[in-house]
Amino acid sequence: MAFIKRSDKKKKPFKKESSLFKRKRYCRFTVAGVEQIDYKDLDTLKDFIGDNGKITPARLTGTKAHYQRQLNTAIKRARFLALLPYTDLHKH
């Protein structure tokens, strides 16, 4: 069985997202001058947790790597102490 290569199909070039609507990301913790992210600051931690309870990656939030590691540790500590839920998928 032979495979026929179709050259009549035109491949569309890959388009990048328009930079017109893209907002520049910045690290909130660097701007605020935070030294250590506290696991008891639940309002801040909730901003970095998605709808399903997953930790939002740094490439989406713009957080620097140093603070992203602290953020991950703080969220995991808050979950362990039952200050934050592991997931929002629990049915009541």
Curated annotation (Swiss-Prot):
Superkingdom as given in the UniProt entry: Bacteria
The keyword rRNA-binding is assigned to this record: yes
SUPFAM superfamilies recorded: Ribosomal protein S18
PROSITE patterns attached to this UniProt entry: RIBOSOMAL_S18 (PS00057)
InterPro entries: Ribosomal_bS18, Ribosomal_bS18_CS, Ribosomal_bS18_sf
GO biological process, one term: translation
Gene Ontology MF terms: small ribosomal subunit rRNA binding; structural constituent of ribosome
Entry keyword Acyltransferase: no
Pfam families (alphabetical): Ribosomal_S18
GO cellular component, one term: cytosolic small ribosomal subunit
Keywords carried by this UniProt record: Ribonucleoprotein, Ribosomal protein, RNA-binding, rRNA-binding
Subunit-structure text: Part of the 30S ribosomal subunit. Forms a tight heterodimer with protein bS6.
Record-linked PANTHER family: 30S RIBOSOMAL PROTEIN S18, SMALL RIBOSOMAL SUBUNIT PROTEIN BS18M
HAMAP family membership: Ribosomal_bS18
Role: Binds as a heterodimer with protein bS6 to the central domain of the 16S rRNA, where it helps stabilize the platform of the 30S subunit.
Family membership: Belongs to the bacterial ribosomal protein bS18 family.
Protein name as it appears in the record: Small ribosomal subunit protein bS18B
Highest classification ranks of the organism: Bacteria, Pseudomonadati, Pseudomonadota, Betaproteobacteria, Burkholderiales
